[in-house]
Amino acid sequence: MTRSIQQDRSIEKSEAKTANFNQESIFKIDELFFSRTDNRGVIEAFNSVFSRISEHADDALRGAPHKVIRHSDMPKAVFWLIWDTLKAGKPITGYVKNRAKSGRYYWVYAVIAPVDGGFLSVRMKPTSPMLATVAELYKKILRLEREDGLSPEKSAAVLLQEIRSMGFDDYMDFQAHALVTEFQARENALGRTPFNALTNAIRVAEAERMICDKIASITDELAQGAIYILNMKLQAVKLGRDRAAIDAISNNYDLILGDIKSGITRLKSIMSDASTSNFSSRKESQILLCASSIMAEVVQNFDQGDEPMTTEERERESVYLRNLHAAFSNKSTASVSAMMDECRQVLGRMDSLRQTLLGLSAVRVSLRVETNRLGERARGLDSLISEIDQSHQRVRNDLEQMFETASHFSSAITAS
């Protein structure tokens, strides 16, 4: 009889969990929760919000593997990517669907980072339209895992491929966009003033993209310069004894064009160095700024909250939280400093290019004067001068737009 009652209770619990499977646990947008694990993923500490949402008793959570809250809707690819990044000593962020003890689900946007002796994860409630997109993506990846028997690593490769097909360069690009989107959605929902440092970092990224596009445009335009020089020399040959002045002008044009090309190459190098360095990456800057702000709020909530911990445990966890906040804050500060240094270099290089372009203008004037002097004998140069004028104007316009953008770039950084 006792065995039958236990079986009945087990069946009742199973049915209750099944009934709750499509119900969402209450996770308020103004809440944040954290958990800290050892290097194996065993839970060592957490706050009261985590235990309430997960519906597990505090004693049951301590010492339990973090996968105790894993939802069956989550593809293994996501966890492979998370662990692969964490083992490399790098933080990672992303969407995760968790399962409460009752069977209810709750979505989180997690910021996870290595800490001394393990890992610390902070979660906020995702509310942007990105969540629906990611939920569908996870369903697709999960289906492939089950139908094709993909290993977690191969599934992660498919996940990254899908992310690239969505228009992102890589996971860094994706997570920066996702975190910023969720962070700003949360800030707006809570009625907070815009986070100026983040807004400016986004503008800087947009400015850099525009500058890189203009550099490519100028590079293409300068490639035509060799054709103009060749045509000048060909026209000079036709002039016979009167060719000396045109030859000299074409040589000067060639020299100045070479200086401009060198300046553009150095500018490209500055932009390339900025995009490949660790903490001058604009996308990473945005992640760091969001993470720093989130951690500051977690620390404040922890200090003011009534957590299920002894005084000794509170002091220990406070150190973990403050250290991670300091790490994110220091790295975001370093990133802003790198942006300021890059900005100074970019503006300096552009100013030099503007001066060099004035020299090219002088050569164009000389060519026009000499063409007018030669009259009918230099008739073939008229159309060439027109082409050079148009090309010069395009380069000038691109350069001025770059300079204006870089100036706004500088103002945004200074305001940060």
Q: Predicted segments — roles?
A:
Residues 7, 12-143, 200, 205-207, ...:
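Sensory/regulatory domains in signal-transduction proteins
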Residues 186-204, 326-335:
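Short, charge-rich amphipathic alpha-helices with coiled-coil/heptad character
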Residues 311-315:
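Acidic, serine/threonine- and proline-rich intrinsically disordered appendage/tail regions
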